[in-house]
A protein has these predicted regions:
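Fe-S ferredoxin-like electron-transfer domains
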Residues: 2-135, 141, 148-168
Length: 170
C-alpha cells in the first residue's frame, strides 16, 4: 500500500510496519528539501547549529545543497530580554505554540495568516516584549530549528570585559 503516517495508524495484531524502506527514505528526502527551501539556511552562524533537528535530518537523509527559494522575510524579533524569534527559520511544527499555550498557559506566540503566508508571530504589529511572555524559554527549548533561541549576552559580557573603566573578575 501507500505511505501512512504513524500518528494516524491504528495498531492491529500481526501488522508489519516498515519504517526504513527506499520509498520512505525518498519521501523523507522530498519533505526535507521542501522544508529547507522555505528555511533561511545560515547554519554556520545559527545559534542552534549542532543542535538543530532539521540539520540532523538533512545529514541523516543525505539532503545537501538545497538553496532557499521562498523563505519568510519577517524581521527578527529580539525585543524580549530572554528569547529571540527568527520567523525565517520556522518550519511551522507548532511545538513552541503548544508549549506556550498548553504548558505555560500564556499564549504569547502563535501562527498568523494562512497557507504559504503562515508565519510565527506575536500578533500583527506586536513584538514578544509587548505580550504576556514570562521569559521562561520553554518555547526555545522545544524549537527544533533556530526559529526561537535564548538570547545571548555574550556581546554585553565582552563589552564589559574590554571596558577600561570597569574592573571585571573572570
Amino acid at each position: 500500500g501507500g505511505i501512512e503516517a504513524a500518528c494516524t495508524m491504528v495498531p492491529k495484531d500481526g501488522a508489519v510496519v516498515r519504517t526504513n524502506t527506499a520509498q520512505l527514505r525518498e519521501f523523507r528526502q522530498g519533505i526535507l528539501k521542501l522544508l529547507l527551501e522555505g528555511h533561511r539556511t545560515e547554519c554556520a552562524t545559527c545559534p542552534q547549529s549542532g543542535k538543530c533537528k532539521l540539520q540532523d535530518y538533512a545529514k541523516r537523509y543525505g539532503v545537501a545543497d538545497v538553496k532557499p527559494v521562498d523563505y519568510c522575510r519577517e524581521p527578527v524579533d529580539d525585543s524580549s530580554p530572554a528569547v529571540v524569534i527568527d520567523p525565517s527559520k520556522c518550519i511551522l511544527c507548532g511545538k513552541c505554540t503548544r508549549t506556550c499555550l498548553q504548558l505555560q498557559n500564556v499564549n504569547a506566540i502563535d501562527f498568523i495568516n494562512r497557507g504559504n503566508e503562515t508565519v510565527l508571530s506575536c500578533g500583527i504589529g506586536y513584538k514578544l516584549a509587548d505580550t504576556n511572555c514570562t521569559s521562561c524559554g520553554q518555547c526555545a527549548a522545544m524549537c527544533p530549528t533556530g526559529a526561537l533561541t535564548i538570547k545571548s549576552d555574550a556581546a554585553r559580557v565582552w563589552d564589559a570585559i574590554n571596558d577600561p573603566t570597569k574592573k571585571v573578575a573572570v
